[in-house]
Design a protein with these regions (language model features):
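Bacterial N-terminal signal peptides
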Residues: 9-21
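Short boundary/loop segments of OB/S1/cold-shock single-stranded nucleic-acid-binding domains
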Residues: 22-37
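Conserved hydrophobic positions within beta-strands
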Residues: 39-43
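Short, structured beta-strand/loop micro-motifs enriched in basic residues and often containing a Trp
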Residues: 73-81
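Short nucleic-acid-contacting surface segments enriched for D/E, G, S/T with interspersed K/R
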Residues: 80-97
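OB-fold/S1-family single-stranded nucleic acid-binding modules
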Residues: 102-125
Length: 127
């Protein structure tokens, strides 16, 4: 009888535990904590996804080559609360993006602020 109750309890605990959403998450340790960079470019792709969204911006360098910069942001629910929709940043949109750059120098950053060509400011965190 005790074994049956123990198995039942273990089964219930396992089911409850599996019901919690499990998602991979990482810290922001790879980004500079204070330093920021600002780039001007054209939206290549806006990945409005969980657990983090990514904004890809093609930047034309001084030597006329291009570099694709990735800007990590919060997931869609947080962006939505901040007033940002996927449709706000279509491919081809000219933008100026400020972010906290990667410590290792790769062309990526944590998205801090964005200004569209029409002057609209998009901040990825609700105020």
């Amino acid at each position: 009888m005790r074994r049956s109750i123990a198995r039942l309890c273990l089964g219930v605990v396992a089911l409850v535990w599996m019901a919690f959403p499990i998602s991979a998450h990482h810290s922001g340790a790879m980004f500079e904590p204070v330093k920021t960079i600002t780039v001007k470019g054209v939206v290549k792709l806006f990945e409005y996804t969980n657990p983090h969204s990514w904004l890809w911006v093609t930047v034309t360098n001084d030597d006329k080559t291009t570099t694709d910069w990735g800007f990590e942001a919060e997931g869609p629910s947080t962006l939505f609360r901040a007033g940002i929709r996927k449709s706000d940043l279509p491919p081809g949109e000219k933008v100026t993006v400020t972010g906290r750059p990667m410590k290792d120098g790769r062309p990526a950053a944590a998205w801090v602020s964005l200004v569209k060509e029409d002057g609209t400011v998009l901040n990825p965190r609700p105020q």
